[in-house]
A protein has these predicted regions:
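Juxtadomain low-complexity/linker regions and immediately adjacent membrane-anchoring helices
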Residues: 302, 311-351, 361-362, 386-397, ...
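Aromatic, loop-rich ligand-recognition surfaces of beta-strand-rich domains
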Residues: 351-462, 570-572
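Beta-rich carbohydrate-recognition and catalytic domains
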Residues: 21-199, 209-255, 270-271, 277-321, ...
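Extracellular beta-strand elements of beta-rich domains used
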Residues: 297, 381, 396, 451-453, ...
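Extracellular carbohydrate recognition
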Residues: 287-291, 439-448, 558-570, 747-749, ...
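Short, aromatic/His-centered strand-loop micro-motif at the edge of beta-sheets
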Residues: 514-520, 711-736
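Extracellular glycan-recognition modules
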Residues: 464-465, 472-504, 510-551, 562-565, ...
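Flexible glycan-contacting loops in extracellular carbohydrate-active proteins
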Residues: 546-563, 758-785
Length: 800
């Protein structure tokens, strides 16, 4: 994307509309309002807190995890994990508070809607019908309404309505609507709102009422591109019939607000605000890296909605800011170990803009350094990494002179996901350096939306400050790896060991043992929740840990009996009873760290290792280890047009004796090279399938087919796959296929010609074996010749 062109266009647009529109990459923009990729937002205010429920985007196709963002001021948002949904897809969540005092959470999978219930807007949730994935609204529950995107509306009399639908553009189709019974488990009335009333209805219905008018708003077009937009119709009844009124939200002139839609509305006093998603800048392939924005709604005297003026400014704070200190990092001089390109330069980490990102060039250890100009007192640093729903490991150091460095926060063993990551200390320094050292997933690197440095203590984000399991004991310390404060309980006296008891791993403090955790922000007088699980009298039970807390420390002590403990938690906010009860029954999730110990060459096969006419039941892998074994018929080595080659006739299938290296999981960089000749190329022929999984974006499959969409490399992703339109012309000729992926861009070359280049994202899962000659499902037999095959777990650009 040409950013200069976009900035100029933004300025021209501002002049044309009569106000100074900020460029999308200016410092301090209010849109996007959240640092990360999220879509399909529902915004609610419960009490004095704003809640943002949204599809977790940037992870394929809304694969979760479940989360909610909370804010007291509508500017500073904190990501909070939720226990449910736990399904494969978690799309388009909506939450409402019922007159019965409970909160109801609606979400969808294709094509069904589920409903959960909780005593708090944060959960814990459980499916209202019992089983976790029990369905409230099955597909076509209302004839010709494809079930998706459920959204509630509560009328003045307390009646609750649910609206849903997708692909409502077909003749006779539209949006499903129903009035829920008082038990929230059934409907007393349903209706199809046809697309003759809601013109071009595609999906994402949202209903609100103002001055006696019911507004039925919805999204039209494709969520993948610029055609996505919001339109509306009105009625004097919640179920209609409705009258179409027009379009109120669409892509702006310069394309920096691209594909806006799937919205909700927040009413604050007499003001109305529309929260919607738009595509990221620069626009990612497929359109599944969406970001949340908000702009003001205005109404004409007749009640019609004026087309929204979309901005990069947003609306600002709706309450007093919870942050009291100045952000010292804003506009600071900055340098970094690397940056991907001009769209992701280091300055974007210190611009207080949730739509711009510093992305390092590599996926290994990378650093970014800020110069504050003069030495300043620093007590808090917020880091907003690219993906708040996965954990990052990092080190923050400070320096007065840029030469001698001291540790401010050591999170190199962190396993807690969150946004912002909040680190506290007290130091006077001019320079601050963040070093990314690893994390939960391969191939995502240490990209950062914002780094914020504060002179004061900024502890407003509601988070889990301490989280410890038995696995966090290293023989000397009990490390706080699942807690935001980091650090560790130190062994003051006695001894401790890990033991499995009552179905759980526990830390056993022998009699007379004392562990102590110190941090100046710990206090019994401040709002908090502290808890743990202990094993007593033959069962696990809640640990009354309040007595362990004093000003600045927590002390665990076993007197005459061992203390058997795990799941020790401390929150800097007060949990409700239901949340405490859930913690008392639920283990802290301790996810593994991604394997980043690269092997280099993982797979290496060559027909040059054999003699012509050899029959080959086994192929030794000259990469990391192992071999490939024929399932039935073995290959025969032939001489074809100057090269030795393994001859596949559609019946030979080989599987590896080894798993795919863990270094190739998730979105890891890779390079794939092969020499292939195929006399008669079919639509889809699989040369090698490196993965055994078969879900979206989980494939690395080398294909030799004429299918222009996926005839060269297949990832099980409609947008991510790549083919070659002129593949038929290569029949009977040697093809040198070279594919390289750096974690963002994938290039595909055939005989030195670049045939595909695009940004993609992969979600490769653990794979039990590699398959040659067909895919892992046993389909797409290969009928051709393979001279050599190589796979590296690193990015190796093709040399000229």
């Amino acid at each position: 994307m040409n950013k200069i062109r976009l900035v100029v266009a933004s300025l021209l647009l501002g002049a044309a509309t009569g106000f100074a529109q900020k460029p999308f990459n200016a410092s301090g923009t209010g849109n996007p309002i959240i640092p990360g990729y999220f879509a399909d937002p529902t915004v609610k205010k419960f009490g004095d807190t704003y809640y943002m429920y949204a599809t977790t985007d940037g992870s394929g196709a809304g694969f979760g995890p479940a989360q909610v963002w909370t804010s007291k001021d509508f500017v500073n948002w904190t990501l909070m994990p939720m226990n449910w949904p736990d399904s494969h897809w978690i799309w388009a969540p909506d939450v409402m508070k019922h007159t019965d005092g409970n909160y109801y959470y609606f979400y969808c999978q294709p094509c069904m809607i589920h409903c959960g219930v909780s005593e708090t807007p944060r959960g814990p949730w459980k499916n209202i019908l019992g089983e976790s994935e029990a369905v409230l609204v099955p597909d076509r529950f209302v004839t010709n309404a494809i079930t998706l995107d459920g959204q509630t509306f509560v009328d003045d009399d307390g009646s609750v309505y649910l609206y849903w639908g997708t692909w409502g553009i077909y003749k006779g189709f539209g949006c499903g609507a129903g009035k829920l019974a008082s038990d929230m488990k059934s409907f007393t009335e349903t209706r199809l709102i046809p697309n003759t009333e809601a013109t071009d209805f595609f999906e994402a219905p949202f209903v609100m009422k103002r001055k006696g008018i019911y507004y039925f708003m919805y999204s039209s077009g494709s969520c993948h591109d610029h055609t996505y937009r919001v339109q509306y119709a009105t009625s004097d009844k919640p179920m209609g019939p409705y009258t179409y009124r027009g379009c109120i939200l669409e892509t702006n002139t310069d394309g920096t607000i691209h594909g806006p839609g799937h919205h909700s509305v927040l009413k604050e006093g007499n003001e109305y605000y529309m929260v919607y998603h738009r595509h990221d800048n620069p626009h990612s392939n497929r359109g599944f890296h969406r970001q949340l924005c908000v702009d003001r709604m205005e109404f004409a005297e007749d009640g019609s909605i004026k087309p929204l003026i979309l901005t990069h400014d947003g609306i600002g704070a709706l309450a007093s800011s919870v942050v009291k200190s100045k952000n010292l990092a804003l506009g600071a001089k900055v340098r970094a170990s690397s940056f991907y390109d001009a769209d992701f330069r280091p300055e974007y980490a210190v611009d207080d803009n949730n739509g711009t990102l510093w992305r390092p060039r590599g996926m290994g250890q990378e650093w970014i350094e800020m110069d504050l100009g003069v030495a300043r007192q620093i007590q808090t640093i917020w880091t907003q990494f690219e993906y708040g729903t996965q954990f990052y490991q990092y080190l923050i150091e400070t320096s007065v002179d840029g030469k001698h460095w001291s540790v401010f926060a050591d999170k190199r063993n962190n396993r807690l996901a969150g946004s912002p990551m909040v680190d506290f200390g007290k130091v006077k320094a001019r320079y601050v350096r963040l070093t990314f050292t690893g994390g939960q997933k391969n191939g995502f690197g240490g990209a950062v939306w914002n780094l914020k440095i504060f002179e004061g203590v900024e502890a407003s984000a509601p988070q889990q400050w301490l989280g410890l399991t038995a696995a966090d004991w290293n023989g000397r310390e009990w490390q706080n790896n699942e807690g935001m404060l980091g650090g560790a309980f130190t062994l003051k006296e006695g001894s401790a060991r890990i033991q499995r008891i009552g179905g759980r791993d526990a830390l056993v403090l022998e009699p007379g043992t004392t562990l102590e955790y110190s941090h100046p922000l710990l206090s019994s007088s401040k709002e908090h929740t502290v808890s743990g699980l202990v094993y007593r009298s033959g069962k696990w039970q809640s640990y009354e840990a309040e007595s362990c807390l004093s000003s600045g420390s927590i002390t665990l002590h076993s007197s005459t009996e061992p203390l058997v403990i795990t799941n020790f938690r401390f929150y800097n906010w007060k949990q409700e009873a239901a949340e405490k009860a859930y913690d008392a029954e639920t283990d802290i999730v301790r996810l593994p760290v991604a394997n980043q110990q690269k092997h280099g060459l993982v797979v290496s096969l060559s027909a040059d290792d054999f003699v012509v006419n050899d029959t080959v039941p086994y192929l030794e892998n000259r990469g990391v280890k192992g071999y490939f074994e024929a399932r039935k018929l073995p290959l025969v080595v032939k001489e074809v047009k100057g090269k030795k080659a393994f001859h596949f006739e559609g019946t030979q299938v080989y599987t590896s004796s080894f798993m795919l290296s863990a270094t190739l999981q998730d979105n890891a960089s890779y390079t794939l090279e092969a020499w292939v000749l195929n006399d008669s190329i079919s639509e889809n022929e699989c040369v090698a399938d490196f993965t055994t999984s078969h879900d979206e974006l989980e494939k690395i499959m080398l294909v030799n087919g004429t299918e222009p969409r996926c005839g060269v490399i297949n990832h099980y992703g409609w947008y991510e796959d790549a083919g070659y339109k002129d593949m038929k012309e290569l029949a009977g000729k040697w093809q040198h296929i070279y594919i390289c992926f750096d974690g963002r861009m994938e290039q595909v070359y055939i005989n030195g010609k670049l045939v595909s280049e695009k940004d993609i994202q992969l979600l490769v899962k653990p794979s039990q074996f590699i398959t040659l000659g067909r895919n892992a499902e046993g389909d797409w037999p290969f009928t051709g010749y393979l001279h050599s095959l190589k796979l590296w777990d690193e990015y190796l650009p093709l040399k000229e």
